[in-house]
Curated annotation (Swiss-Prot):
Role summary: Mitochondrial membrane ATP synthase (F(1)F(0) ATP synthase or Complex V) produces ATP from ADP in the presence of a proton gradient across the membrane which is generated by electron transport complexes of the respiratory chain. F-type ATPases consist of two structural domains, F(1) - containing the extramembraneous catalytic core and F(0) - containing the membrane proton channel, linked together by a central stalk and a peripheral stalk. During catalysis, ATP synthesis in the catalytic domain of F(1) is coupled via a rotary mechanism of the central stalk subunits to proton translocation.
Subunit structure: F-type ATPases have 2 components, CF(1) - the catalytic core - and CF(0) - the membrane proton channel. Component of an ATP synthase complex composed of ATP5PB, ATP5MC1, ATP5F1E, ATP5PD, ATP5ME, ATP5PF, ATP5MF, MT-ATP6, MT-ATP8, ATP5F1A, ATP5F1B, ATP5F1D, ATP5F1C, ATP5PO, ATP5MG, ATP5MK and ATP5MJ. Interacts with PRICKLE3.
Key word Transport present: yes
Topology with respect to the bilayer: Single-pass membrane protein
Entry keyword set: Acetylation, ATP synthesis, CF(0), Hydrogen ion transport, Ion transport, Membrane, Mitochondrion, Transmembrane, Transmembrane helix, Transport
Cellular location(s): Mitochondrion membrane
The gene coding this protein: MT-ATP8
Coiled coil (residue ranges): none
Pfam families: ATP-synt_8
Residues modified to N6-acetyllysine: K54, K57
Name used for this protein in its record: ATP synthase protein 8
Domain of life: Eukaryota
Transmembrane segments: 8-24
Length: 67
């Protein structure tokens, strides 16, 4: 059984890593980022729900009189 030649693995892994790094740097550098990020104000809108204005009583089974 022939032995696996691993002498070129270091060069292959190193060149692949460098190539991926360069490609990612190019991809990031070509991306358009906003120049001045600003804070967006969040306005909460109060909605009038019909059940908020009414008083409701919830009867739990334990508070009912015994029969």
């Amino acid at each position: 059984m022939p032995q696996l030649d691993t002498s070129t693995w270091f060069t292959t892994v190193l060149s692949t890593t460098i190539t991926l790094f360069i490609l990612m740097q190019l991809k990031i550098s070509l991306h358009n980022f906003p120049q001045t990020p600003s804070v967006k104000s969040i306005k909460y809108m109060k909605t009038d729900n019909p059940w908020e204005s009414k008083w409701t009583k919830i009867y739990s089974p334990l508070s009912l009189p015994l029969q």
